[in-house]
Amino acid sequence: MPAQAPRLWLSPLAAPSGVGLSPHEEQWCAALPAALQPRYRATRQQLRARLAALFDVPPATIPLHSPPSQPPRLEQGWGFVSISHSGEQLLLAWSPWAVGVDLERRDRVLQADLLAERFFPAQESQALLALPGEERRLAVLRSWVRKEAAIKWMGSSIAQDLRHWCWDATRQELSHLQQGLKPPSRCLESAGWFCGLVGEGAATVQWGEHH
């Protein structure tokens, strides 16, 4: 097991990895619509390459189970992984503990008022709507990446749980209003991207090489 701190890697989706897919991954990739195959191939190749470097083992030996449209999993004892992509950028995470990540462009144009009112808990949306326009847009984005990361961390869905997650910027606390969960979370900024991370050890996360 590598160092006991979560790792993040941010890179272009098309970055060369020099790594192949497993036989199962090749089959899953071939079954996808042609338009989706390059993204699936690139994400799994990069994930294998990052993990191989982290564990110092050949990429083909990484015990990764990663069918399309399912959260990627490692065998017990190898830790946990999470994937997020936005446009042509890819965010990967590894952690000794359950982890979720999300990625959004810092300059993404969005209807911050509408998002806050429709999808955020009342107490959070009220605080957000009191902010000036650009500050509000950035605050909504920072909250959003934490919440999407939290949904991946708990293995849930946006439709089921987005409105139950609340980010208290004053307390710096992310909480699930129904289940009482309060996982550690971070919103990091790198090269014009907001990177949300949720899970144990978030405070000690380290960027991997060449992020």
Placement of each model-derived feature along the sequence:
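Conserved nucleotide-ligand handling architecture
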Residues: 1-211
